[in-house]
């Protein structure tokens, strides 16, 4: 098990459903599950390659950046990436990832995405999550004229590859 995998396991075991995690989510008005959809370099690289033609040379705002791996890979294609993450439970891993490989064109912002409206603007806003899909889409549209629901696109292209709950989240949007 890699160092990051071990850290993720510790976060899942300690924080998911804890009183402090639930209180934080309520206090900040976020709906964040302690489940990452991009948790390794392979997944992040594949998603970034999928998005590359639409983000090349552009400013990207990633909503719900988790531990920041996708943002790092997006930075290989985009001119600038702003990664916004509201859930502090990922902060230990986030710091580890940043210390190892953060490039200058990728910035990380900690807080609910709506806190940065009017401050951060992009050409493209993306979200790659199963948490609060509808809310993520609504806030993403306020950051950029082009919004990409990464898993929405992937599920639409190959619905049989995803479980019923992932498909149902997109049917409600």
Short names for language-model regions:
Residues 67-77:
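Conserved SAM-binding loop of SAM-dependent methyltransferases across substrates and taxa
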Residues 94-95:
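Conserved SAM-binding loop
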């Amino acid at each position: 098990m890699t160092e990051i995998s071990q850290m993720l396991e510790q976060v899942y075991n300690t924080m998911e459903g804890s009183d402090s995690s639930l209180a934080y989510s309520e206090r900040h008005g976020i709906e964040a599950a302690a489940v990452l959809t991009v948790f390794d370099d392979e997944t992040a690289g594949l998603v970034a390659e999928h998005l590359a033609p639409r983000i090349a040379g552009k400013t990207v705002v990633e909503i719900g950046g988790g531990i920041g791996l996708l943002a790092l890979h997006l930075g290989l294609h985009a001119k600038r990436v702003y990664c916004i993450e509201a859930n502090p439970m990922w902060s230990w891993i986030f710091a580890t990832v940043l210390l190892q490989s953060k490039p200058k064109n990728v910035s990380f912002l900690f807080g609910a995405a709506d806190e940065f409206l009017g401050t951060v603007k992009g050409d493209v806003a993306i979200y790659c999550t199963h948490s609060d899909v509808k809310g993520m889409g609504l806030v993403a549209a306020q950051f950029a004229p082009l919004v990409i629901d990464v898993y929405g696109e992937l599920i639409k292209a190959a619905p049989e590859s995803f479980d019923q709950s992932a498909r149902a989240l997109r049917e409600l949007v």
